[in-house]
Amino acid sequence: YGLTHALHTALVCMLMGPRLGWDASRTRTLVKAALTMNVAITDVQGRFAAVGHLTERQRDQIRAHPQEAAQALRVGGVDDEVWLRAVEQHHERAGGSGYPMGLQEVDETAMALRMADVFMAKISPRVERAALSVQDAARQMYAEAQGHPSAAAIIKEYGIYPPGNVVKLASGELAVVIRRGAT
């Protein structure tokens, strides 16, 4: 789960950046943050997803992973502060209800990363729940994000009917979506 989640989140970020009007450099930074946001828990993330209910120790690991991931990246030579801040803050929520620091204000790149992370988590199945449909995930995310531009960008770029979805046409025929449409 951990590696595929990071890859899928990075792909959503790659689509979202230009939709937000970000240049290639800023979008690349967002993608790098998505690929590395969970580096501190990659080895256990799949087990956590398979277990369903977490122990208090496992919850502590989850709460600490943003700062631990950023520290591991620093030790590995990453010095891009936007990248590091996005990783550190990708579970923060404006107003202080996020973790690990309970920040009142959250970096814009971190917010974009969080939206992509949440969206991909919603459409991924877990032991304790089925995956949400793209439509339901988009609706929930947009409502929870209170119209944040990153949520809108994901919905517009990912689409309500992404490639691979089976849809019923007005004629009653079934079809498979083969590409994203212009939105």
Q: Model segments located where?
A:
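Histidine- and acidic-residue-rich, metal-dependent catalytic cores
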Residues: 1-183
